[in-house]
Amino acid sequence: MAKTSHIYNELLQLLGQSKTWADIRHLHTLIWMVIGLICSGCISLTKWTIYVDSRAKFAQSHQRRFSRWLHNPRINVQRLYSPIIQAALSKWGSQEIVLIEDTSMLWNRYCLIRVSVRYRGRAVPVAWRVIEHKSSSVSFDVYEQLLRRTWRLLPIGARVRFMADRGFADTKLMQYLEQDLGWHYRLRVKNDLWVLQPGKTPCQLRDFHLNLGDAILLQGGKITKSNPYGQVNLALARDPISRELWYIVSDEPTSLQTFREYGERFDIEEEFLDEKSNGFQLEQSLVRSPIALSRLCLVLAIATLFLTVQGQQVVQAGKRRLVDCHTFRGNSYLRLGWEWVKGVLYRGWRLFPTLCLSGAVDQEPAIASKKHAQKSLEREFQVRTFSFAS
C-alpha cells in the first residue's frame, strides 16, 4: 500500500459526507489531486501522478485523468465546496467572523476574486470567482453574487466584519453590506474621496494635513460629492514608523482600534503568497481557462483548509514542538499542518479526523521575532475626533 493511501482514506471520509457529488469518481480524483499538491508542494499535474495509488500503470493516465477533471463541465465548484466550508464554520462559536475580499492577477490575463475567512494570521477560502480580466479592479456588479453566496454559508446569527482594500471602496458595496447582508465593514479608501461636513465646504481626504503620528477620527459624516452617502465614520492617520497614510471608512464609530482591525486584511495576502511563491506555486500552472482555474482553486482551497485544521489540532494537542523549531509559534497553522502531514507519511503519525475551524482565541499567536513585536508597540498617535452626526 502506498504511503499516501492513509491520507486518501481520511480525506475520503471527511469529504465523502457531502451528497452533492454527481459522480463519486469525481471525488476520488479530487482527493488524489489534493494529495499530489500537498506532497509535491506545487501545481503540476505531472508531478502529482507519482503519489496516486491506483490500478493505472502509466503516469500519463493519471495526468489525463486530472486534466479531464479540471475541464469537466459536471464539476460545479461552488456546489461542491459550499457544504465543505459551511461544515468547517459550523462550530465557529460566538466569536466574530472576519471576512476579507481581495483580487489576485494571474499572468496579467485572469483575475481571481476571492472572499476568505480570516483565521489566526492567515485566511481560508470561502468563495471565489475567476474571470478573464486584465485588471485587479472589478466593479460591484461582478462580485455581488459572490457576497450573497458567502452570506448563505455562514452560521446563522454570526457577527461579521468585512474588509477590503481601496479597489472595493464603493458606496454600492457599503449599502449592500449594511442593508442586505447585515455585516459591519472596514474599507480602505483613496485620498481623493470627498467628505461632506455640515456647515463646511466639501473637501477630499488629501486636504486633511497629517503629520507623523497624527490621527483624525470623523464620526457620522457623508461621503462622495455627486451622490452623498452616509452616515459613515472615517479614520485617518499617518503611521509614525512606515510614514504611510491610511484612510479607513467604517459603518461603526472609529477609533485607533480601527487601524488594527483593518490591518487584519493583510492576512489574505499571506494566503495568496501560500498559493504562489511561498507555497503551492500557482503561477507555474499551465491551465489557461477561467472555469478550469476555478476548479484548480477548489483543489487549493481544500488543501488549505485541510492543512490549516491539521495545524490547529497539532497546537491544540500540545504537539507543536514536534514540527516547529521555535520556542514560540513561528510558523502559520497551514505550515504546521503541512509538516504534520509529512510526519504522517514518514514517521507513522496519525491525522486528526476533522475539517472544522475553531473561532476561539488563538492561544499561541505567531511571533515573527521579538524585535518585530516590540517595534509594533512603539507606535504613538495624537488623536483628534470630530462628530457630525445629527
Per-region residue spans from a language model:
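Single, function-defining residue in the core of a domain
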Residues: M1-C42, I50, L80-S82, W92-I97, ...
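DNA-recognition alpha helix
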Residues: L45-A56
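Major-groove recognition helix of helix-turn-helix-like DNA-binding domains
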Residues: A59-N72
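Short, basic alpha-helical nucleic acid-contact segments in DNA-binding proteins
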Residues: W69-P83, A88
